[in-house]
């Protein structure tokens, strides 16, 4: 991606995160960059093309992070075998990496803020918010935990309940990170360590 296209994407997303996607025009984006609309159109067809490129970039980043940390990059229905050998350590590392990504990466943080704003204005954005930030991660963890339970890595329990219990603190701490100068990562790291200890077969035997 050229430097100009990158600047257009990051500037547009920052404006979307501040004012909402619908409220920002191509003229606003071009003006912020000090370029004409015609110059911007050399790189993107329209505002929707910019948004689609932003979403594609986020999905690519998520897939790359999944592969780097040894967790599935696709949904369970598409690649069930990739869920069979996921370790608790891989899930922990991926969770920490995702927390850093959503809170420390400016592009990801702006994407999350944009979705938070737009979920109440657009059914499409609400669906995207659910897929990226809410229901999607819960369903993903449910599938991982179901496989862990089936092979005895975790004790027998309702995988949906475990997914909700695991993801809820993550969701909350990501949300409050925008308003807190103190890092929430230590709290999350301690929690996920406790979670896997609590639901490990070894812990049940000790109890």
For the regions a language model picked out, list residue spans one by one:
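Hydrophobic alpha-helical connector segments
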Residues: 66-108, 162-163
């Amino acid at each position: 991606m050229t430097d100009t296209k990158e600047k257009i994407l990051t500037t547009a997303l920052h404006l979307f995160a501040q004012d909402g996607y619908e409220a920002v025009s191509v003229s606003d984006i071009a003006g912020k960059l000090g370029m004409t609309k015609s110059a911007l159109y050399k790189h993107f067809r329209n505002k929707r093309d910019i948004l689609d490129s932003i979403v594609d970039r986020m999905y690519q980043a998520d897939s790359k992070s999944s592969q780097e940390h040894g967790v599935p990059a696709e949904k369970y229905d598409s690649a069930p075998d990739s869920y069979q050998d996921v370790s608790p350590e891989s899930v922990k590392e991926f969770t920490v990496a995702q927390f850093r990504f959503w809170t420390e990466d400016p592009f990801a943080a702006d994407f999350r803020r944009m979705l938070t704003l737009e979920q109440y204005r657009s059914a499409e954005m609400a669906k995207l918010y659910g897929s990226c930030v809410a229901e999607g991660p819960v369903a993903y963890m449910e599938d991982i935990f179901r496989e862990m339970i089936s092979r005895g890595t975790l004790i027998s329990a309702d995988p949906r309940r475990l997914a909700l219990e695991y993801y809820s603190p993550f969701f909350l701490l990501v949300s409050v990170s925008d308003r807190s100068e103190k890092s929430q990562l230590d709290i999350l790291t301690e929690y996920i360590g406790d979670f896997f200890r609590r639901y490990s077969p070894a812990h049940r035997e000790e109890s």
